[in-house]
Design a protein with these regions (language model features):
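A cross-taxon signal for low-complexity, glycine/charged-rich
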Residues: 190-193
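Non-catalytic, surface beta->alpha helical segment in thiol-disulfide oxidoreductase systems
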Residues: 155-179
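Conserved helix-turn-beta segment immediately C-terminal to the redox Cys motif
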Residues: 23-25, 32-61, 80-84
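N-terminal "domain-start" segment that seeds a small globular fold
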Residues: 1-18, 36-38, 115
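Thiol-based oxidoreductase modules, predominantly thioredoxin-like and allied folds used
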Residues: 53-71, 87-98
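Thiol/selenol-based redox catalytic cores and closely related redox-interacting motifs
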Residues: 79-81, 85-161
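Extracytoplasmic/secreted proteins, especially bacterial periplasmic and envelope-associated proteins
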Residues: 42-45, 75, 99, 103, ...
């Protein structure tokens, strides 16, 4: 279960995910030098809007994709605060795939099929050259997002190009204890729309 994991924050202190029981969570593998880095702005807007209602964002920077999260934890946190006003929790830099994969991510990847929009297939085709040898459930790029309900269930996985604004409607439903429905498009056998 999600709440069984203990992770390191940006200051290398242990944080039990059980601290987030009863909250709606968005877990993301961020990066400071990626084309999707401006999503930090949208993420912060979601946080500002919904944090008072029990919403949290957990950012786990990863340098695995073209080394787009260079620098120390302190530098990454400083960059995000300075450029995007990030106030949500940022954790220690991790690997999301492979031999040194963070156990939390090993778990997350088994819990939900990825929601993709129409541009995702084209994006993944372009990224193939940079990510050879990935397993079917592996994270494909920075800013893959996992949405977690108040009970700790991973209810959705969103591709990197799915924006925070596209996820907002699902956050609202989970905060109201409504179920969300992710519609799988028949043209996408490897994902949902």
């Amino acid at each position: 279960m999600l709440y069984d994991f203990v992770v390191k924050d940006a200051e290398y202190k242990d944080v039990s995910l059980s601290d987030y029981k009863g909250k709606v969570l968005l877990i993301v593998n961020g990066a400071t030098g990626c084309g999707f880095t401006p999503q930090y702005d949208g993420l912060q807007k979601l946080y500002d809007k919904f944090q008072p209602e029990g919403f949290e964002i957990l950012d786990f920077p990863s340098n695995q994709f073209l080394e787009q999260a260079p620098g120390t934890n302190e530098e990454i946190v400083g960059f995000c605060k300075l450029n995007f006003g990030v106030a949500f929790k940022q954790f220690s830099k991790i690997d999301v795939n492979g031999e040194n994969e963070e156990p939390l991510y090993k778990y997350l990847k088994t819990q939900a099929e990825e929601y993709r929009n129409k541009e995702t297939v084209e994006l993944y085709e372009k990224l193939k050259q940079y990510t050879p040898g990935l397993e079917p459930n592996d994270i494909r790029w920075n800013f893959t997002k996992f949405l977690v309900d108040k009970g700790g269930n991973i209810v959705a996985r969103f591709a990197p190009n799915v924006t925070p604004e596209e996820i907002e409607q699902h956050i609202i439903k989970l905060l109201r204890d409504d179920e969300i429905e992710i519609i799988c498009h028949p043209d996408f056998s490897n994902g949902c729309l």
